[in-house]
């Protein structure tokens, strides 16, 4: 009887040891979780949509031996109030880091306060906060590009194109009559792009005359509507269409195509961003040129920052400016080099 009890106890002890070892191995092998909360001003924005898809791929390619990365992506649809609520929801759900494409760059006190209270780092992207806000806390960062550079490059592309294609000056008056499709009322990038492209054209020796500047909110359909109105007003006097982004440049082209304007009366079109559709239009010589906004570089920087911020890793290899800003340079895209960028897309 005693022998039977002793054997039973030995079996139970052995089972407990096995259970303990098994649990210990599970704990060793168990990965830690990183939860990234993302909110965009408008996912219908073509460039933002492409940037987010690239960001998802970059996060998936990170070294995840120790961590599983999950992500929630929300669309503010242009509403800062909605975005504030989304940020609060993701914080309550336990996110480790926030990536925010602001709906309103001048109204982010609620977001920063909520993140600071829970010690959650924020990476703002594409729509740059004002310096005063970003300097409120050492866990606030920005990833994007310099809007002025895009305007300067766009102006240089326009000047080079017109010098090589003097027929753009259809009425032969020595001046280029142009219209601008601007991104958004009061938006920093839109204002800076418009100002810098105008300055760049003048600095590169062009004589120019602005016929109109219309707000189209970065949107292809709105740009088509605005351009249709401008064609009705100015008829064949428009020699150049400058758009703050590719989507609006393509919308302007849509207007001419829908109205059936003869090719000899169609102006030259220039955009910014190098979206998939924009690059295709350059390949087809419908869009004279664009300026490439490096979404791959921005997505990579965002993913690295998010990973390091969430895990407490060293950021010494991040190429910051003023310890907070990561800027990726723009690049000029013409029919001569567009395939280099399209290849990168594939």
State where each predicted segment sits:
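Flexible loop/hinge segments that line or gate small-molecule binding clefts
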Residues: 111-149, 168-174, 275-283, 287-288
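Hydrophobic alpha-helical segments within soluble ligand-binding/sensing domains
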Residues: 83, 142-174, 223-224, 274-278, ...
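Extracytoplasmic "Venus flytrap"
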Residues: 35-62, 72-85, 93-95, 101-105, ...
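Hinge/cleft segment of the Venus flytrap/periplasmic-binding protein
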Residues: 10, 32, 43, 174-185, ...
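Short, solvent-exposed amphipathic alpha-helices that sit
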Residues: 47-63, 150-154, 188-207, 222, ...
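Hydrophobic alpha-helical
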Residues: 55, 88, 100-117, 196-197, ...
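Short, low-complexity disordered leader/linker segments with a strong preference
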Residues: 1-35, 91-92, 113-120, 339-342, ...
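Short beta-strand elements in bilobed, periplasmic/extracellular small-molecule ligand-binding domains
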Residues: 61-76, 177-180, 202-216
């Amino acid at each position: 009887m005693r022998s039977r009890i002793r054997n039973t106890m030995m079996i139970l002890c052995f089972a407990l040891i096995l259970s303990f070892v098994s649990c210990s191995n599970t704990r060793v092998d168990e990965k830690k979780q990183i939860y990234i909360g993302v909110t965009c001003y408008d996912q219908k924005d073509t460039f933002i949509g492409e940037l987010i898809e690239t960001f998802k791929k970059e996060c998936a390619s990170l070294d995840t031996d120790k961590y599983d990365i999950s992500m929630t992506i929300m669309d503010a649809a242009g509403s800062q109030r909605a975005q504030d609520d989304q940020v609060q929801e993701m914080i309550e759900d336990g996110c480790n880091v926030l990536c925010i494409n602001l709906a309103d760059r001048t109204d982010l006190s609620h977001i920063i306060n909520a993140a600071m209270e829970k010690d959650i780092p924020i990476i703002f992207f594409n729509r740059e906060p004002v310096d005063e806000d970003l300097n409120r806390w050492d866990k606030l960062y920005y990833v994007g590009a310099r809007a002025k550079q895009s305007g300067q490059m766009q102006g240089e592309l326009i000047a080079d194109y017109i010098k090589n294609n003097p027929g753009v000056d259809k009425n032969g008056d020595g001046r280029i009559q142009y219209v601008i499709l601007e991104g958004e009322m009061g938006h920093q990038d839109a204002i800076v792009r418009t100002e810098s492209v105008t300055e760049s054209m003048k600095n590169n020796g062009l004589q120019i005359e602005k016929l109109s500047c219309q707000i189209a909110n970065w949107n292809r359909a709105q740009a088509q509507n605005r351009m249709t109105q401008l064609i009705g007003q100015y008829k064949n006097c428009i020699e150049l269409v400058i758009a703050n982004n590719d989507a609006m440049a393509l919308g302007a082209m849509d207007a001419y195509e829908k109205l059936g304007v003869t090719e000899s009366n169609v102006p030259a079109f220039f955009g910014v961003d190098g979206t998939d559709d924009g690059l295709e239009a350059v390949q087809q010589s419908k869009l004279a040129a664009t300026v490439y906004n490096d979404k791959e570089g921005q997505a990579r920087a965002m993913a690295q920052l998010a990973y390091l911020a969430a895990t407490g890793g060293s950021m010494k290899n991040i190429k910051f400016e003023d310890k907070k800003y990561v800027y990726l340079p723009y690049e000029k895209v013409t029919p001569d080099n567009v395939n280099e960028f399209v290849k990168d897309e594939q």
